[in-house]
Amino acid sequence: MGEYERTVFTRRITGVETEYGITCVGDNSRRRLGADEAARYMFRPVVEEWGSSNVFIPNGARLYLDVGSHPEYASAECDSLSQLIAYDRAGDKIVDQLAQRAETALATEGIGGRVYLFKNNLDSLGNSYGCHENYLVSRDVVLKTLGRQLLPFLITRQLICGAGSIQDGQFQVSQRADHVWEGVSSATTRSRPIINTRDEPHADSHRFRRLHVIVGDSNMSETTCALKIGSTQLVLEMIEAGALSHDLELSNEIAAIREISRDITGMAPVPLKAGTSMPAIEIQRRYAEKALCWLEQRGDTEGTPNAEMHKVVSLWLDTISAIESNDLQALSRDIDWAIKLSLLRRAQRRIGCSESDFTHPKLAQLDLAYHDIRAGRGVFPVLESKQLVNRWINDTDIEQATRIAPSTTRAALRGEFLTAAKKLQAPISADWLRLKVNRPEPQIIELTDPFENTDDRVDQLISYMRNHAASYSTDTAIS
């Protein structure tokens, strides 16, 4: 384990990429827009304001249309758990505002229609789209070696943070479990692994790697999201520190992830490479109990404070205990799949279905409506507004995160640069690493350390734009 002892990130750069499902329901007999056309209407204001449908915005995030006309929001670099949840939720608000503007444009043009955005991972045809987690790790880490200790956790993690789904008339804990085909791979779509190893650190490649986890479900619940990200951060810390001594490697990772998704009790035995087997929920308990011990020696440094991590571990252990005792009611305010299942159970009773029958169309409608992000319309937003589910952060944090980049990471520099460029209508381009002023003479800098939130070179770029503001035309594209 010596290879992990050199760097333990208790302050870790983390980000989440969310692809949203989109559909447009026309008014009465008017023509219905396809998803691709609805997405183009939605991104019209983005193109008008920034000159592209693939942009970085002043809160530090990337906003773009992904393959298959899925609006995608990639959060800015965050270095604490609550910060990340705020910027993830900010993405929901930003894309929903675009959807509402699209509805206004459709009405103005006499087309009409309601644009629906779903924070889920499956469409009605069974196509899967993702919620990708990004964790900064040291270049010292060999991802395939790390994967051997991380995969048992990620495969069983769906029990504590799955979004729940009806597939083929059956309830499953996870929406993504049936749509991954490898444990660790450099592919993303063709074979779709649990951990993607493509080497794109978006930082100094001599110092950092980006661990790209693509197996997770999109979460509506803040507490579920906090448990998903917080538990993973703690497991990574323990792996880096050499604090995980047990061997829980699974004999067949893909068979296991599918079987676990179909067993809400978590008690189905999972075969291990060692030749024994263990219930999935027991594997989670092993990790959670190790995390509780780890917190005693972790140290309260920058990033997510120990008090918040203790809150994560407490929720983690409580969730495991509730699943072990089949007390799903205890999870019905905190864990997405259990919240959804409790709603489906009520609907089954109203319809007259048995608890094992999920074939009724109204259940599928409820399954989808749970993920509608529109306040006052989506099922989960209504639960949240009625205080029927628990929160991790508050609305003020989310609103601020829609406008201002995280102040503690590199994103602050990008946000400051983009805000100034927008005000000055300067011709610029930006990505995760680079900031560029295109004219009069190209000026470019690279920000290779995602932990740094100050840099004199950014101040110089902004001064350069101000000095040449008179030469910038009003139709300049910002990309």
Swiss-Prot record:
The keyword Nucleotide-binding applies. Mg(2+) binds at residues 17, 64, 72. It catalyses: ATP + [prokaryotic ubiquitin-like protein]-L-glutamate + [protein]-L-lysine = ADP + phosphate + N(6)-([prokaryotic ubiquitin-like protein]-gamma-L-glutamyl)-[protein]-L-lysine. The active site is at 66 (proton acceptor). Pfam families: Pup_ligase (PF03136). This is Pup--protein ligase. The lineage of its organism: Bacteria, Bacillati, Actinomycetota, Actinomycetes, Mycobacteriales. One of its GO terms (biological process) is protein pupylation.
